[in-house]
Amino acid sequence: MEYRSLTLDDFLSRFQLLRPQINRETLNHRQAAVLIPIVRRPQPGLLLTQRSIHLRKHAGQVAFPGGAVDDTDASVIAAALREAEEEVAIPPSTVEVIGVLPPVDSVTGYQVTPVVGIIPPDLPYRASEDEVSAVFEMPLAQALHLGRYHPLDIYRRGDSHRVWLSWYEQYFVWGMTAGIIRELALQIGVKP
């Protein structure tokens, strides 16, 4: 796939043709979800946030909108939509959910389900001052180019964990967020 010319139609066709395998073993039992917001344009964008530097966990990191599943959430999809509305003011009714990726174990003990959704291009994003310091859009074709991600092996508590890292403009994209973007690229058939 030529990543420089990815259209929204190409992305949707590839995503729907290659359904993800969800039967992954996970070590964590606490549930969380993130929304992967794809901005509806002929050349689609990927909406990302930078977390507030005042947060206890993952301060200042680039992330998708998301968080823990609450008792009031009907599903992981509902949790992702609720969190996206709380963090960046994306109304749930404007999100066209097209599917989910396999859950990912976070270092903080959550099983995180990435929910892929298409959002309108003209939404007035409003970052939650408590949680988000910036909202930015990255061209989806650039985000899904696997050559931009570099492996880094981190040793923690006697175990080795591979994380991926990249950057876009002044933003450093790494860890679970970079891993989810890579998983999305592999899901639509991008070759390493």
Curated annotation (Swiss-Prot):
Functional summary from the UniProt entry: Probably mediates the hydrolysis of some nucleoside diphosphate derivatives.
Assigned protein family: Belongs to the Nudix hydrolase family. PCD1 subfamily.
Entry annotated with the keyword Thylakoid: no
Gene: nudL
Protein name: Uncharacterized Nudix hydrolase NudL
Signal peptide (from-to): none
Motif (Nudix box): 67-89
InterPro entries hit by this protein: CoAse, NUDIX_hydrolase-like_dom_sf, NUDIX_hydrolase_dom, NUDIX_hydrolase_NudL_CS, Nudix_NudL
Keywords: Hydrolase, Magnesium, Manganese, Metal-binding
Class of the enzyme per the UniProt entry, highest EC level: hydrolase
Gene3D superfamilies: Nucleoside Triphosphate Pyrophosphohydrolase (3.90.79.10)
An annotated GO BP: nucleoside diphosphate metabolic process
One Gene Ontology term of the molecular function aspect: manganese ion binding
PROSITE patterns: NUDIX, NUDIX_COA
Domain Nudix hydrolase: 29-160
Cofactor(s) listed in the protein's UniProt record: Mn(2+); Mg(2+)
Enzyme Commission number(s): 3.6.1.-
Residues reported in the UniProt entry to bind Mg(2+): 83, 87
